[in-house]
């Protein structure tokens, strides 16, 4: 249900913003998700510890109801959007550029998730940070995601291709630098922020590209983007676990992330080259 709601929100926000501001609109929606992670997770943990685990779920219900009421009251009537149906939406699965974009997201973000899954262990084992400092590092990661969505939206409005390729390249460089410099505490903290920033700046661009290449099937395409990110989460954690289990240490997932980001660049280049020889919506 959450994926369905989010895909609807993204497509409606992009429509309201207009062609020149779609990236910023999508980025602002994704920005909300990042802020929810930064503030919601620790808040829920505090509520659970203080008032019991049921209190966190109760707050979610209250916030959800308040959000629905707010949408009913302030969301303008949407005009000019094409109506669609399930068969039309499923047509997105026939378009090669939709699949290319989903693969870019899966592979590119896989490296970011490989890094994040083992970040706690890397900071305490290799950087030798105190356990009490790790929450601050995770907060930096969350702030990086917030900044990345904000920056990525502006870049996507100017060039979706630049936002994707630039984000993947910067992510590869940041992950590589972390693998080399993580023994220095200041470098590790700064790079933790940069990995999150560079990775997250791709999100608005990928979502915008999916809406472009999906033609009349934008809602399903938007939902599939979140599915691709969930696959990236699982695959990144799995690949990171493989290299850690093989004895390469907790910095090895960052190297895996570099490889996946480079693979994402390769897929992006192929997708862009192929798109030049295909009709719109193929």
Segments (PLM) and residue ranges:
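A membrane-interface helix-boundary motif in multi-pass transporters
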Residues: 49-61, 242-261
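A late C-terminal transmembrane helix in Major Facilitator Superfamily
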Residues: 213-249, 257
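Juxtamembrane intracellular "pre-TM" segments in multi-pass secondary transporters
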Residues: 74-104
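Extracytoplasmic gate region of multi-pass secondary transporters
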Residues: 99-138
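Cytoplasmic helix-loop-helix junction between adjacent transmembrane helices
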Residues: 1-32
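C-terminal membrane-cytosol helix-exit motif in multi-pass small-molecule transporters
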Residues: 61-81, 267-271
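C-terminal transmembrane helical hairpin of 12-TM major facilitator-type secondary transporters
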Residues: 162-206
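Helix-to-loop junctions at the C-terminal end of transmembrane segments
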Residues: 148-160, 244
């Amino acid at each position: 249900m959450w994926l369905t709601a989010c895909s609807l929100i993204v497509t409606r926000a992009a429509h309201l913003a207009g062609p020149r501001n779609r990236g910023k609109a999508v980025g602002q929606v994704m920005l909300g998700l990042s802020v929810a992670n930064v503030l919601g997770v620790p808040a829920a943990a505090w509520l659970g510890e203080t008032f019991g685990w049921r209190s966190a779920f109760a707050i979610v219900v209250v916030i959800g109801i308040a959000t629905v009421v707010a949408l009913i009251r302030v969301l303008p009537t949407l005009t000019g959007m094409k109506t669609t149906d399930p068969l039309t939406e499923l047509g997105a699965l026939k378009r090669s550029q939709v699949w290319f974009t989903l693969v870019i997201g899966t592979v590119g973000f896989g490296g970011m998730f490989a890094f994040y899954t083992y970040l706690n262990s890397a900071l305490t084992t290799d950087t030798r940070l105190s356990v009490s400092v790790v929450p601050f590092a995770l907060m930096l990661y969350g702030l990086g995601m917030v900044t990345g969505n904000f920056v990525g939206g502006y870049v996507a409005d100017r060039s979706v291709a630049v936002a994707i390729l630039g984000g993947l390249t910067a992510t590869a460089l940041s992950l590589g630098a972390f693998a080399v410099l993580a023994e220095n505490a200041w470098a590790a903290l700064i790079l933790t922020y940069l990995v999150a920033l560079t990775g997250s700046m791709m999100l608005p661009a990928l979502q915008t590209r999916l809406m472009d290449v999906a033609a009349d099937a934008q809602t399903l395409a938007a939902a599939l983007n979140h599915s691709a990110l969930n696959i990236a989460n699982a695959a990144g954690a799995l690949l990171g676990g493989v290299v850690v289990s093989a004895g390469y240490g907790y910095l090895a997932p960052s190297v895996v992330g570099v490889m996946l980001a480079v693979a994402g660049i390769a897929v992006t280049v192929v997708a862009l080259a192929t798109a030049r020889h295909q009709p719109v919506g193929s």
